[in-house]
Amino acid sequence: MTEPITVPTPQQIIEPAVAGRTETMVLNMGPHHPSTHGVLRLVLELDGEVVVNVAPDVGYLHTGIEKTMESKTYQKAVVLTDRMDYLAPLSNNLCYALAVEKLLDVEIPERAQIARVLLTELQRISSHLVWLGTHALDLAAMSVFLYAFREREQILDIFELVSGARMMTSYFRIGGLAYDLPSDFIPTVEQFLAVMPSRIDEYEDLLTANPLWLERTVGVGVIDAQSAIALGLTGANLRATGVAYDVRKAMPYSGYETYSFEIPVGKNGDIYDRYRVRIAEMRQSVKIVQQATERLRELGPGPVVTSNRKVAPPPKREITESMESLIHHFKLWTEGFKPPRGDAYVSIESPRGILGCYVVSDGSPKPWRVHFRAPSFINLQSLAHMAKGRMVADLVALIASLDPVLGEVDR
């Protein structure tokens, strides 16, 4: 005869509280959570609603991009870089292209250099608009989300005009650009520049002095400059602590040393300062785009790809007239070029911080190794430092303020 099933009472299950003793609990936040979108899991240790520790668990969006690039020719690998930081694909294209160009020691035409700067700064604005809209939405400010995506739509229209794609553009090539800018490119950019400064003013009117925004961001997620440097923070997250470090100024590339712009910095290293820094960065990017647009207009038509025929294919007109040029074009795209044995490292200022690319060549048409220094991966490691002692409700705002893109974290 079986024993009867007995159900324990709540008093038997719950251990009575002991005076002076507290216990922490471990909970999962994500990956199935509105703020993590299925791609990030946070293991939280909580004392009530107070965060004791945070352990990010990544890998939910792993794509193996770095390994896949080893099986592609150098030029074909460009398309894979779009998929890392998918909110700033042009920055990924540029970093990889600069590293391979350094390996090849090729010169880039001035028109291509200016176009690269112009488009990556538009990309920076676009990325910051996504951050601003989603960050505000996480804190229940839906109007800002709608307004920010209104301007982002204009930028994506410009990318579509240039490359035919709104996000995965693959427009930059090793040696220059895929093809020249369209004739209506400059007028379209100028239309955007005419309205963008006033739009940024609108965002600030809605948020900068908003009491609810201030309550959720001022003094929350604080990190000092010394800790930020020790943890490897870069980009707006570092500059919000008062450190005026920007690769575009410290180690200029693509002619950035010839442009006039400032490095916005914060003081307190909290969520609010990270917000103010990114807003100011959008204004500086508008300033750079204006200068680049003027230079393109003054420069006029010209080549947008290197004249080195070991790297770049012959012009289209030659392919239709010369069998040798047709064969050259075919072999260059099917077999690829062969850089000399060696390695090269290049870092740029992406919207999320320092993006680095390390390329190793063994003399074959395919890279022996490609490694990216992804700023989002490093910035995420600071989450525990900033979250300790804060309420669980602050975590959503804190994650958003770091602006991570899990595509480059799990590359």
UniProtKB/Swiss-Prot annotation:
Principal location listed in the UniProt entry: membrane
This enzyme's EC code(s): 7.1.1.-
GO CC terms: plasma membrane
Membrane topology of this protein: Peripheral membrane protein
Swiss-Prot/TrEMBL catalytic activity: a quinone + NADH + 5 H(+)(in) = a quinol + NAD(+) + 4 H(+)(out)
Record-linked Pfam families: Complex1_49kDa
Annotated GO MF terms: NAD binding; NADH:ubiquinone reductase (non-electrogenic) activity; quinone binding
Subcellular location: Cell membrane
Keyword line: Cell membrane, Membrane, NAD, Quinone, Translocase, Transport, Ubiquinone
InterPro entries, sorted: NADH_Q_OxRdtase_suD, NADH_UbQ_OxRdtase_49kDa_CS, NDH1_su_D/H, NiFe-Hase_large
Family note: Belongs to the complex I 49 kDa subunit family.
Function: NDH-1 shuttles electrons from NADH, via FMN and iron-sulfur (Fe-S) centers, to quinones in the respiratory chain. The immediate electron acceptor for the enzyme in this species is believed to be ubiquinone. Couples the redox reaction to proton translocation (for every two electrons transferred, four hydrogen ions are translocated across the cytoplasmic membrane), and thus conserves the redox energy in a proton gradient.
UniProt subunit comment: NDH-1 is composed of 14 different subunits. Subunits NuoB, C, D, E, F, and G constitute the peripheral sector of the complex.
Listed name of the protein: NADH-quinone oxidoreductase subunit D 2
Organism of provenance: Chloroflexus aurantiacus (strain ATCC 29366 / DSM 635 / J-10-fl)
